[in-house]
Amino acid sequence: MKIKLITVGKLKEKYLKEGIAEYSKRLGRFTKLDMIELPDEKTPDKASQAENEQILKKEADRIMSKIGERDFVIALAIEGKQFPSEEFSQRISDIAVNGYSDITFIIGGSLGLDSCIKKRANLLMSFGQLTLPHQLMKLVLIEQIYRAFMIQQGSPYHK
């Protein structure tokens, strides 16, 4: 199985880079992880709804160009389904059993994701109603993917 993580915006914070590097290394035992950072569009202060929609569309075009036709796509969205870690682990396992070799996770930029990305997604997933920086979500998601594999292995890491 290969996991692809598509994110909008460049990661700048050193502490986040270090955490992501650590969990990426750990994940290497279980899966190939491909991380794709796409540039975000600059959002003007007090942007209109039309400007925001235009920005989301441009970011969506970049995202769509990186999604494989046969990828199982999980998009992070506040309105998505929340899972306990054990259920998330089982979902990842089930996706592989159902014939998907590539899982693509998508984290949008500061404005979120365009509706076309949400429609393409096989699953909308949420980590709750909290608003978190999308750069931080990258670290949280990678840790949860690692945790999912550790749960599948019966490791005490999850305790």
UniProtKB/Swiss-Prot annotation:
Catalysis performed (reactions): pseudouridine(1915) in 23S rRNA + S-adenosyl-L-methionine = N(3)-methylpseudouridine(1915) in 23S rRNA + S-adenosyl-L-homocysteine + H(+)
SUPFAM superfamilies: alpha/beta knot (SSF75217)
Subunit text: Homodimer.
GO MF: rRNA (pseudouridine-N3-)-methyltransferase activity
Protein name: Ribosomal RNA large subunit methyltransferase H
Family matches, as NCBIfam families: PRK00103.1-3, tRNA_RlmH_YbeA
Gene giving rise to this polypeptide: rlmH
Pfam families xref list: SPOUT_MTase
Cellular component per GO, a single term: cytoplasm
Domain of life assignment: Bacteria
E.C. numbers: 2.1.1.177
Originating species: Streptococcus suis (strain 05ZYH33)
Coiled coil regions in record: none
Purpose: Specifically methylates the pseudouridine at position 1915 (m3Psi1915) in 23S rRNA.
